[in-house]
């Protein structure tokens, strides 16, 4: 009996030794809604009048400068509890106005220190709020960028315009990864428009993986829905349990964060919603009994809860500290909290050729939508200039 016991101990010791010899690299990928990151100048053809010096928010250089400082502080702090001095390799953003605000944001000392760069394509949103990606070139190499439009269905107004899906293709840890950033329509118009969005993102993910089967896809954004809602759980097919995820599904780690732990990223009437999600394709998962570290795999997710992001007093104590509320400038951050996921990969493992990393071409329906949006943009700009 003793001999068997000591033999078992020897096997366990060997396993621990082998395990200890393996070293893993960790990469963080984040998302953060910037809550109206506007500059102080009018963009021709855009309804950005609230965010001008004479607008309802009295948006001036002082407030814009504080906003840039605050958001860059939060972005640079994301994931640094786990990865001190490194933070996120890639961060998706929503509610940014244009290239100028992204240039100014990345020039802030907190982000400039890590050489963050950005990807952005102007979208058709009439207010001028878009999605973007910032990234550290030392960790993520960009290969291709496209903004795939939201195409209205026959049940919707043919001229319904909203933010599309910003796809950024590149190399992370030498592997082909595509990040899709979305900001789905608000809740004011009912759930259907977001369910359409979820289905279109799923179709885009499938097109990407049909072109590049080994590509790993990360969908992120302000979904204006919780993980439990139909747009996410059914239309996007984002499941809460790794063991439930089939080849045509995705994994949503935030489902249980909300349902089991009651945590969220956006407080409404005293209750938390979790709109800010980062969702993963199946090839980023290790299912039960499989521990493959030779390629990038999901490790964990975290809501980023830096203390300075919260109200510490008053009626909304415990909620997010916004830039403005009730017409009052609070010199805060955002009405949303940032989120991050962590991926791991064993060091020293050879990586397969990632291929060209190019994104799929636009469909005919997408091309038509892009052309229509461009004509509408030109008409708005002409009318705007005529008023001046």
What do these predicted regions represent?
Residues 98-100, 126-128, 187, 224-230:
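Active-site environment of divalent metal-dependent phosphoester hydrolases
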Residues 28-31, 89-94, 117-120, 131-135, ...:
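Structural recognition of the beta-strand scaffold that forms the well-ordered cores
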Residues 20-21, 205-217, 225-388:
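Metal-dependent phosphoester-hydrolase catalytic domains
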Residues 21-29, 38, 139-141, 160-185, ...:
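Beta-strand-turn-beta hairpins that frame and shape the catalytic cleft
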Residues 35, 97, 185, 223-226, ...:
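Catalytic metal-binding/acid-base residues of hydrolase active sites
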Residues 90, 96-176:
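Structured beta-strand-rich core segments of catalytic domains in phosphoester-bond hydrolases
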Residues 20-109, 119-129, 315-317, 344-388:
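N-terminal, active-site-proximal structural segment of metallo-dependent hydrolase catalytic domains
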